[in-house]
């Protein structure tokens, strides 16, 4: 396998992993620990 093919597959997999983890953090069980600054703000 050529180095460019390996590099493109590695970068694609890394980006998909980061995207999947960020979606899991935003909408999954860890999202209960996130704070909402708009709810904390009082006018």
UniProtKB/Swiss-Prot annotation:
One of its GO terms (cellular component) is cyanelle thylakoid membrane. The keyword Transport does not apply. Keywords: Cyanelle, Membrane, Plastid, Thylakoid, Transmembrane, Transmembrane helix. It is a single-pass membrane protein. The keyword Membrane applies. GO terms for biological process: photosynthesis. It is found in: Plastid, Cyanelle thylakoid membrane. Belongs to the PsbN family. May play a role in photosystem I and II biogenesis. This is Protein PsbN. The lineage of its organism: Eukaryota, Glaucocystophyceae, Cyanophoraceae, Cyanophora. The gene is psbN.
């Amino acid at each position: 396998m050529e180095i460019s093919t390996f590099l493109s597959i590695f970068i694609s997999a890394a980006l998909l992993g980061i995207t999947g983890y960020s979606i899991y953090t935003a909408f999954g069980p860890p999202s209960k620990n996130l704070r909402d600054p708009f709810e904390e703000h009082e006018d």
